[in-house]
């Protein structure tokens, strides 16, 4: 079976994907590299070309090679060549289940969660319903038509795209001017609106190993440089602090780990996931679950693996075994 790292994509998170692919390429030097470009074409990519791309979070990657076809054609080739896809992809059709179902109908093994789980987790509104059934507390939603009343009631709101990642489109609602911004943004995509919750940002990974063990990784405490953990704070500002393990009390750490595990199971995730929380004065509050969290050198999940004493390459090898085993079932 030929191990192939698939990266890029047609959505806003393709820059992060390139950085994840660089980390995966370094850990899996014998893997082939396929770059999925914004026009849906797929390109075989040289290792040197990927690794010399020095500013992946800021500049678009250019494969510099001829296309092997559009994504569906590339997946047909992956099936005929007995390839296993290691997904260095994030967001959009790469994480919402569309790519996953295209692989499943062809019998192509791939890392990460399956299509059904990916689809549910990617929709923040639907995911909240699933995790709440499992006993995970999440903020109450605010209908767009009630946003003015909710702002008067709560004093501050948070609005974000219901199906997007890396905190793209995040709007803090403090005034009528912000309400106008939300309404304008909601014309092009569905927005999730919630009361602002004061507290410490936290995230907690969950890992499935090839021997069947499923457990939570050490929670991470996040202190954004500019007050919100958006794309810039995540990947561009060195002053953002990500403390792993987080400086939480033993009780709060245990609670975060339990809730992350519950969310992973409630959403039927596979392989690995990462769930984000706000630790309020009343305890951890669920925000969202990522089925393909970033795997860049600057990303949170690899930091949690390191804190757990797990080598990145061992994590990847386990995910490859899990992907192959799932396809054989």
Give the label of every model feature segment:
Residues 174-258, 279, 284-285:
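Phosphate-binding site of ATP-dependent enzymes
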Residues 2-7, 75-80, 118-199, 210, ...:
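Active-site nucleotide/adenylate-binding loops and adjacent lid/helix of ATP-dependent enzymes
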Residues 26, 101, 129, 262, ...:
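Surface-exposed charge patches
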Residues 1, 250-329:
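ATP-dependent carboxylate activation and anion-phosphoryl transfer catalytic cores
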Residues 112-113, 167, 241-243, 297-301:
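Short small-residue beta-strand/loop micro-motif enriched in glycine and branched aliphatics
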Residues 109-110, 138, 157, 312:
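Hydrophobic beta-strand scaffold residues
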Residues 1-111, 115-116, 121-122, 126, ...:
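ATP-binding N-terminal substructure of ATP-dependent carboxylate-amine bond-forming enzymes
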């Amino acid at each position: 079976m030929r191990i192939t790292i698939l990266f890029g994509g047609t959505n806003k998170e393709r820059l992060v994907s390139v950085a994840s692919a660089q980390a995966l390429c370094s850990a899996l030097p014998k893997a082939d590299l396929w770059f999925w470009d914004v026009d849906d074409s797929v390109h075989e990519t040289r290792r040197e070309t990927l690794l010399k791309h020095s500013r992946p979070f800021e500049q678009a990657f250019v494969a510099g090679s001829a296309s092997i076809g559009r994504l569906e054609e590339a997946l047909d080739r992956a099936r005929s060549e007995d390839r296993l896809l290691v997904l260095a992809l994030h967001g959009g059709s790469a994480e919402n289940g569309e790519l996953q179902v295209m692989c499943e109908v062809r019998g192509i093994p791939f890392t990460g969660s399956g299509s059904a789980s990916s689809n549910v987790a990617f929709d923040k509104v639907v995911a909240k319903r699933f995790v709440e059934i499992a006993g995970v507390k999440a903020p109450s939603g605010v209908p767009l038509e009630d946003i003015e009343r909710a702002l008067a009631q709560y004093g501050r709101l948070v609005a974000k795209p219901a199906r997007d990642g890396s905190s793209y489109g995040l709007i803090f609602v403090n005034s009528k001017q912000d309400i106008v911004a939300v309404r304008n943004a909601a014309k092009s995509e569905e927005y999730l609106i919630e009361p602002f919750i004061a507290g410490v940002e936290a995230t907690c990974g969950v890992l499935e190993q090839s021997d069947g063990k499923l457990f939570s990784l050490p929670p991470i405490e996040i202190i954004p440089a500019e007050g919100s953990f958006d794309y810039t704070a995540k990947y561009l500002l060195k002053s953002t602090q990500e403390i792993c393990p987080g400086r939480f009390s033993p009780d709060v750490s245990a609670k975060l780990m339990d809730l992350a595990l519950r969310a992973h199971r409630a959403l039927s995730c596979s392989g690995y996931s990462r769930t984000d929380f706000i630790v309020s004065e009343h305890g951890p509050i669920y925000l969202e679950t990522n089925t393909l969290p970033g795997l860049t050198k600057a990303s949170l999940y690899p930091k949690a693996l390191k804190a757990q004493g797990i080598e990145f390459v061992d994590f990847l090898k386990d995910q490859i075994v899990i992907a192959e085993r799932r396809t054989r079932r």
